[in-house]
Design a protein with these regions (language model features):
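Short, polar loop motifs at secondary-structure junctions
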Residues: 64-68
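Gly/Thr-rich phosphate-binding beta-strand-loop-beta motif of the actin/hexokinase/Hsp70
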Residues: 2-20, 100-116
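Short glycine-rich, Thr/Ser-proximal phosphate-binding strand/loop in the N-terminal lobe
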Residues: 4-41, 121
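Glycine-rich phosphate-binding loop plus the immediately following alpha-helix
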Residues: 119-174
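Short, acidic/turn-prone active-site loops that include or flank metal/cofactor-
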Residues: 31-34, 83-90, 126-134
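Single conserved hydrophobic/aromatic residue that forms the stacking wall/gate
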Residues: 180-189
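Phosphate/pyrophosphate-binding loops at sites that engage ATP/ADP/AMP, CoA/4′-phosphopantetheine
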Residues: 43-58
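Conserved phosphate-binding catalytic cores of ATP/NTP-utilizing and phosphoryl-transfer enzymes
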Residues: 70, 75-104, 109-119
Length: 189
């Protein structure tokens, strides 16, 4: 078996990985302004950095919202599309070896995928808030999109300054029948 290259052309990043008989090889993330530039940039950088010849590749599998822009084989290689939710479910099952799990894929948006028995995979929901929201808000409010800088800033912060607590909206604890939280606690507790 030769190598299969998996490429997730997302809304803001392209993720690429190779799989061969020995397992997963060298994951990589590439950012670009448009999906086609991101796809070809990721593919070229991946095979160059890892010393992979086009002859070593049996197949290219594409997924993600940006993969819809690709309707021809990449560099003459066998190229197919797969459902992003199926790919997320299969990938999480493969990595975790769990038979039953919920996969939370937080990209530009966030999706929830249910895996049952390691075989039945279904998309159970999602929200439009994810890493793209964090990057956009960080760019506007903090003047940086660099996630490492954002994390450093967050580590210096005081969570009580932004995390709404029950005592902030109610001066008495909620009845036990509604929750176990006391007035000074947050949902994180």
């Amino acid at each position: 078996m030769g190598m299969v290259i998996g490429i997730d052309v997302g809304g803001s990043t392209t993720k690429i990985i190779g799989v061969d008989k020995e397992g997963i090889k060298h994951p990589m993330i590439v950012k670009a302004e448009d999906p086609i530039t991101s796809l070809f940039g990721a593919f070229g950088k991946y095979i160059y950095d890892n010393g992979i010849s086009l002859n070593d590749i049996d197949k290219v599998m594409l997924t993600g919202v940006g993969s819809a822009y690709v309707n021809q084989p990449l560099y003459g290689l066998s190229t197919d599309h797969t459902d992003e939710f199926l790919a997320n479910g299969l990938g999480a099952h493969y990595n975790s070896q769990l038979q039953d799990l919920i996969v939370v894929s937080m990209g530009t948006g966030t999706s929830f995928v249910k895996v049952e028995g390691g075989k039945n995979i279904s998309h159970i929901g999602g929200i439009g808030i994810g890493g793209g929201t964090i990057q956009g808000l960080s760019r506007l409010l903090l003047k940086t999109q660099n996630i490492h800088q954002v994390v450093k800033m967050a580590e210096k912060g005081v969570i009580e300054n932004i995390d709404l607590q029950i005592k902030d909206i109610c001066n008495t604890p909620l009845p036990v029948s509604y929750t176990h939280l006391r007035a000074h606690e947050t949902c994180a507790d």
